[in-house]
Amino acid sequence: MAAHVFPMCERTRKPVHFSETVMEILLREARNGTDPRYENPRGITLLLLLCLVLLLTVWNRHEKKCSIPGPSFCLGLGPLMSYCRFIWMGIGTASNYYNEKYGDMVRVWISGEETLVLSRPSAVYHVLKHSQYTSRFGSKLGLQCIGMHEQGIIFNSNVTLWRKVRTYFAKALTGPGLQRTLEICTMSTNTHLDGLSRLTDAQGHVDVLNLLRCIVVDISNRLFLDVPLNEQNLLFKIHRYFETWQTVLIKPDFYFRLKWLHDKHRNAAQELHDAIEDLIEQKRTELQQAEKLDNLNFTEELIFAQSHGELTAENVRQCVLEMVIAAPDTLSISVFFMLLLLKQNAEVERRILTEIHTVLGDTELQHSHLSQLHVLECFINEALRFHPVVDFSYRRALDDDVIEGFRVPRGTNIILNVGRMHRSEFYPKPADFSLDNFNKPVPSRFFQPFGSGPRSCVGKHIAMVMMKAVLLMVLSRFSVCPEESCTVENIAHTNDLSQQPVEDKHTLSVRFIPRNTHTRNRKA
């Protein structure tokens, strides 16, 4: 037989594919098996082998087509190594690493569970808009440590309870609550700017992030709690709670069995729980002494829900806690990055100041002005695209699904790399900070600073009002001047739950230089 095959190859000089040669030989033998001269089962056996080869070939091609790129399993080393990388580098940094290495759809493992890291716009949008991804993932023991396991709204994966508490958040963050926001933001920002001398050191520097956090926590208190509090003390406890949240979110179970390892984190979480409980008790006492109850705020609504048996005391405390912490470590840092970007882009700052003067003139800021501040809104959107504070979202599939042709089993963890998605080629200058990126309307599938769909950020509208108001008040009264070397690109930062600047004096110290004229009805 070889004498027939190889001379033929020699004469034709054509490449011979192994699978084609095997098929030809098998078919020849199968034909021989049907010849009366060959009464044996060889033909049937070879036909069965042929079918098996074909099935294996098709299966292999199917697997290659339907498997998402990522590190190999390698006898369990792949899951272990990827999990260690997420713990060591932080969730955000590790996700960027895997997307950079394997592409915009990557399969990794966290705590032994298959996890997808998605930055492809169409895939991210698919997950955001479908209700089967309303659950989040994280260590059960870690979430219990910080009070978020099946409580509150941020990481509550009890979908039924999450929907119930979301209605209270939605009521507080829209409607009359949204209408009051602008007035309170203006008043709080101006009050803190009037007292700027108390935060200024001997060299004339101000810790700008501390200032912004004080403004934001004061706004949150006035809107949602409205009780006397010590801003600095509460901010210290919020910061420790946030550090704990980042630390325990994906830690393995054995971490929580080693008491000496996580005692400080558990104590930090408990400190904030106790502080929030004290504030709620203050509000409860006020309600008991009030003669008339009108226009109930967020905390008051929750207290009444608890009294009617709709919510537990623990859930009320966690909801108030999450409402209070949401802005200081997201919105305040977003505004901090925006102030840095303005100093790196002086022409953009000039355009914003001109617009403020044109739209407001000598009048006080009103809701009707906000829709006319097109340059300011464009700047905020570009800042959120170029350097988002929260650039990842965490989901878990509640049902089997198919994303971009790939099968996603129920229970799969999903990390949505929104920050990387925002650098897609849809934008004219995806790698640069430029208002040109928003010269035309951007479809929602390419721009998701607050998410979309059933689990989108419930406070996205109020956040835009707060950012516009705080920026406008600060810029109209002061020129904010950081150190020359302090830019968004070169300041040290971490990226775990969110992008956080490393808080050292050099990074956060800026000068507030009063403007000679400003666009408010206020004397210079």
From Swiss-Prot:
Q: What is the main EC category here?
A: oxidoreductase
Its localization reads:
Membrane
Gene Ontology MF: a single term = iron ion binding
GO cellular component terms attached to this protein's record: endoplasmic reticulum; membrane
Q: SUPFAM superfamilies, alphabetically? A: Cytochrome P450
**Keywords, A to Z?**
Heme, Iron, Lipid metabolism, Membrane, Metal-binding, Monooxygenase, Oxidoreductase
* Biological processes annotated in GO: female gonad development; lipid metabolic process; response to estradiol
InterPro entries cross-referenced by the UniProt entry: Cyt_P450 (IPR001128), Cyt_P450_CS (IPR017972), Cyt_P450_E_grp-I (IPR002401), Cyt_P450_sf (IPR036396), Cytochrome_P450_Monoox (IPR050196)
Entry EC number(s): 1.14.14.14
Q: Known CDD domains for this protein?
A: CYP19A1 (cd20616)
Instruction: State the function annotated in the UniProt record.
Output: Catalyzes the formation of aromatic C18 estrogens from C19 androgens.
Q: Can you tell me which family this protein belongs to?
A: Belongs to the cytochrome P450 family.
**What is the name listed in the Swiss-Prot or TrEMBL entry for this protein?**
Aromatase
Q: Which organism is it from?
A: Ictalurus punctatus (Channel catfish)
